[in-house]
Amino acid sequence: MLFRSVFGDGTVVIKRTVGHTPGHQALFLKLPKSGNILLSGDLAHYTDNWEHMRVPSFNFNKEQSIKSMEDTAKFLKDNNAVLWIQHDLEQNAGIKHVPAYYE
């Protein structure tokens, strides 16, 4: 999985997660107090999709999507990170919203 550190220190990293679209990316945040978080973008639309590696029919490339999901699962484990799935309403209800924040 290719990546680019935005500030050069690994605290904000753009990760290549192609499949949904040819140039799809996810954003990794290394937060000193809140821990490591990966914002999934459209890598998975719901937790159930993620847990069962289900890919929507409208994705650009199913095989690339599954490979990106597998690579991301390893990345999450290696970096002790949690995955935030933007479209998952149940997960979204359990995270802080403005004006609250993560540090």
Question: What spans do the regions from the language model cover?
Answer:
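Short, small-residue-biased leader/transition segments that mark boundaries at the very start
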Residues: 1-2
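Cap/insert and terminal regions of metallo-dependent hydrolase folds
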Residues: 22-103
